[in-house]
Design a protein with these regions (language model features):
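Short, solvent-exposed loop/turn segments at the edges of extracellular beta-sandwich modules
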Residues: 162-167
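Phosphate/adenylate-binding glycine loop and adjacent helical scaffold
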Residues: 1-139, 170-173, 180
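Long, charge-rich, low-complexity alpha-helical segments
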Residues: 155, 177-180
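Short tyrosine-centred short linear motifs in exposed loops/low-complexity segments
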Residues: 141, 149-153
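Hydrophobic/tyrosine-rich beta-strand signature of extracellular beta-sandwich/beta-rich modules
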Residues: 157-159
């Protein structure tokens, strides 16, 4: 999701790169590193041993469908994190802050968005853990997006901010983003 602020209507919308988010479907194809020595599926994440910080994803050895945090050469299979957006001056918002909320996810399993630092994890958004449903002042961020089951997921997002004088609440419509 990429937040966009519209000064003319005092409202938000959500995009993916240069398209309205509701007109976008993100596809995770079967993709491989193609190194020849050790081909790895870039469209999967296997939960490694001795990483208790990844326990929220499942047990060690669990295989998840994934859009990688850093897809690498050829941009395979897909990278989709958070965009910096077109917000402009944030002084129009109370505390100069605005929020991206994950309202709901409809799909056959769980969806998680996080940063893997190698020895620790920063969780961002989760379909099932309500403690991870909001990101304050979202910025350009590279995230893993994982899915416990293959299939179609519809993630519904909303942007919200309060006016600097506290008299108005600005928000986007609830906007779907499809993953498959």
């Amino acid at each position: 999701p990429i937040p966009v602020w519209h000064d003319d209507t005092n409202s938000f919308s959500l995009n993916t790169i240069n398209m309205p988010m509701e007109k976008t479907a993100l596809w995770i194809p079967k993709a491989w590193t193609g190194t020849g020595e050790k081909d790895e599926a870039k469209s999967q994440l296997v939960i490694p041993a001795k990483r208790p910080d990844l326990a929220f994803l499942g047990a060690e050895g669990t295989v998840l469908n994934a859009a990688p945090q850093n897809p690498g050469p050829g941009n395979t299979p897909i990278w989709a994190g958070l965009g910096a957006g077109e917000i402009g001056d944030t002084d129009k918002f109370e505390g100069e802050t605005y929020t991206l909320d994950l309202i709901s996810v409809d799909g056959p399993g769980r969806m998680e968005m996080f940063i893997d630092n190698g020895d620790s994890v920063n969780r961002f958004l989760s379909s099932h853990d309500t403690a991870y449903r909001s990101v304050y002042n979202p910025r350009h961020t590279h995230l893993y997006t994982t899915f416990t089951q293959p299939g179609r997921y519809v993630a519904n997002y909303k942007m919200t901010a309060r006016s600097a004088d506290g008299t108005a609440i600005y928000s986007s419509p609830i906007t779907p983003l499809v993953w498959q």
